Amino acid sequence: MAEKEMNFEEALARLEAVVKELEDGRLPLQKALELFAEGIGLSRICNRYLEDAEQRIAILTADEKGGVVLRELGPSPAAREDTNDEL
């Protein structure tokens, strides 16, 4: 049975633990490389959750008649630039 995908909080907590282990600097090279690869994967999981949340955010604005309109908020210019950069 496939392991369920982590939620954002689980992925972020594990990513923080991986970073802490790597920053410690006492790992053998092979273990450090394995943790680095895991961290990249966790970073991508977190990024997907954040992108999904960003797409769901809606802002309320008043239309010209004073009514309330629900409008989807698109990604920020910085977020669009970041997604165009490949690692």
UniProtKB/Swiss-Prot annotation:
GO molecular function: exodeoxyribonuclease VII activity
Disulfide bridge partners, by residue number: none
Main EC class the enzyme belongs to: hydrolase
Localisation: Cytoplasm
A Pfam cross-reference name: Exonuc_VII_S
InterPro entries: Exonuc_VII_S, Exonuc_VII_ssu_sf
UniProt keyword list: Cytoplasm, Exonuclease, Hydrolase, Nuclease
Domain of life from the UniProt record: Bacteria
GO biological process, one term: DNA catabolic process
The enzyme's E.C. designation: 3.1.11.6
One GO cellular component term noted in the UniProt record for this chain: exodeoxyribonuclease VII complex
UniProt xrefs under PANTHER family: EXODEOXYRIBONUCLEASE 7 SMALL SUBUNIT
Quaternary structure and interacting proteins, as annotated: Heterooligomer composed of large and small subunits.
Function: Bidirectionally degrades single-stranded DNA into large acid-insoluble oligonucleotides, which are then degraded further into small acid-soluble oligonucleotides.
The name this protein goes by in its record: Exodeoxyribonuclease 7 small subunit
Species per Swiss-Prot/TrEMBL record: Pelotomaculum thermopropionicum (strain DSM 13744 / JCM 10971 / SI)
